[in-house]
Amino acid sequence: MSSINTETETVIKKILPYMKRRGYDIEKDFDFETAVSTTDRYTKGYVDILVTLGKTHPLFLIEAKRIGKNLTNKDRDQAISYARSKEIKVPFVVVTNGKDIQCFNSKNKQRIIWDGRRSDKIPSRSQIERVVKILRAKPEEIMISISNDESLPFRQGLPLRQLNALFAKGHNTIRKIEKDEDFAFADFSKLLFLKLLEEKNDLEENFTLPYSYRFYELAETPVHNADQVKNAIKSMIEQIVQNTSYGDVLREPLRLENPRTYLGLVKDLASVSFCDCSVDSKGAAFEYYVRATLKGKKLGQYFTPRELVQVMTCLVGEDKIINSVVMGSTLKVLDPACGTGGFLVYLMQETLSKLEIKKKNRELTQENYDQCVKKIKEEIFYGSDANKGVAASAKMNMIIAGDGHTHIVHEDSLSINAVNWKVENPDCNLIMTNPPFGTAEGDSLAKNDKEQFQVSTTKGQYLFLQKMIDCTVAGGEICTVIDEGVLNTSKGASLRKYILTNCIIRAVVNLPAETFKPNKINVKSSVLYLEKRKEPDFDLEDNYRITFCAIDSLGYIGSGDKIRDYDKSVFLEEIKKNVMNHGLGEERKGYHWRAYDVWTNVIAEDLYFRLDYKYWDPKFKKELSRLVKEDCPSIKQLNMIVTARGISPSSDCYVDENDGYALVVKAGSNISRFGELVITQDSDWIEKSLYDEYLQRCEENNENRNIIRKGDILLASTGDGTLGKCCVFDKSIPAIADGHVTIIRVDKNVIDPYYLADYLRCGFGSTQISAYYSGSTGLIELTPEQVDMIIVDTSGNKADIDIQKNISKNIRRTEKKYTAQIEKAEKVLESVEEIWG
């Protein structure tokens, strides 16, 4: 097969999956870009696809036009001119724009009617020789029977953005016509399920539907007969419920009332071939619809990108499930927060695919194969979700993927009554999941539910992690997505010790910031890969290496668009073979990843048992160790007051400068990224009476939390975009710091305040801040205790105050030069308007 390299490449790639389903071998049956010497054009022509079946004489050709271009008689005539050329001589042609398919007789230019109807079909490979034989005998024939072919006509697959738009359109259809969207997700899911069943019926020989209705036929119904579509859909559901083993997923009645709603949704769904959409696109679009219609953000639901699912599968081992199945081992794979079933569908399909390969390689008898298929579909995969509609969708997904819905349950996984896992009877061999982030599940749990958990908490993730550990068999594995805060906050220390006590931590994988951004979720997260211990290690005496890995790209940007030339196969192969390969050295890196090892005895000595990648980074630790050896002081040693943050005044107490007495220094607006104190007419002030209250409180408690003096160093200590900003308060006016600012007061004879401020905002102090801060996206902070840990570089000549001042002056001089150049460049850009006059 020659390569495809034309302006119509995208169109050709859209129809190739359809041709493959029709039985054609893309490599052996097609020639691409075949030159044609006899043509109506003045220049040489090329046939986009010539169907030869590997023979000397071609059978028909396919002419592809640009996506979005309406097909015209001119397009038909061009294809037929190729068909009539001396090199080609085929009896019929196909013209397509990636959306429509039209077949024409090469002799009379008439549209060919297959089985008495004009449809977007191409004869299958098993039918084509008979079709060509008919046309050779009757060159002008246009009414051709292809054995009552009941296959679906061609429809295009859609990329993610267009699928999102299609699903959003469906949601709008329900909202506008029904005037009620409470059941939009459940109802749309049922119609989508019917369409997916229709495609499954088209693809699989051993799967049949108990009715003859088809979406593409119903879509042709005129609006005044829309009630026929409504009746057809209800009849389809009724027959599935009554006559199939999977009918329970459709038992909940449809709430849609208006026939026009049914017709509109059927038209939209009939326009797409979902089996030709990428798995990523289908899953992402479905999850997009979940969020848009369920208001399910309370449950922390969001889509786990396929690339991340693949990374997690590579970590635990791609062949683990199939090997267990073939060997006859007992295996239970659970996702306790399964959503619409993304993990389970992927794992089941991959396992079935690997089993098929083993059969083709003659490693299994047909009987072995059949037994394994049955086991994979019925005994291995379990899933739970707290939302009834989402759990039903997971069942639907599993049915479409291969009828593995038996153990998908609508339940609260954290309840003691959950059926898919029990703390008192651990039976999970592998848990792969992405549990809800940011939920406070503990508040909704009954007293007996809480008794399951040894580490008391209300955080949903913490509860999920504990129950995962407690419900996994010894030697079983857990691979879960987690909020970064689980790895580093002081509140999570008890949980991390519980993990270290009960599990061997195989890997902690730091994920790129854009991991969940395609679905409008901005969460910094990691993957935690654990193995359940046979016996708890209460004293944390077991010393082994934990792999810490950072991935810088999963192959797509924040919008979801794929990165050109990103080689996912190379990336996944290295994740599988190299990331946890300690033999490659304690520090190792590869294609879009970097990893290092840390011994657990070091982590056990850490006050908070931190497990975040940035905290243990070897480069950071090496420089920190150097400063400690040089006997450099910490902030705790330098600060003449207790390092602390106060409480912000109520915004009701803020006044303008004219009415105020003391400035309120805010981390976001009063401290610049270049180390300057910023006071504007919009700055907030408080009256003297309130300032005196703060002053009195400091004197009574014998500690200063937010009263600022001239020369104090002010460190912004919370929030994305503000944390780490630092300045020196250089005004002789009363001021207090808000609750997001840490005050550091030093002896100017020991260290220069400006040097320290610059060290914290752009020197190695900034690196320490990045390593020490805790929390996750949107909720990060540097606690006073973490500020105290920062070591200040006074090594060598930096101990000299004059040297410190000179370093700071040079830094600020360079920054002012930079800002001046930026301002100058902006003025140059503004002059563009003057060019227009």
Task: Briefly describe each language-model feature range.
Residues K710, L714-R761:
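A short beta-sheet element
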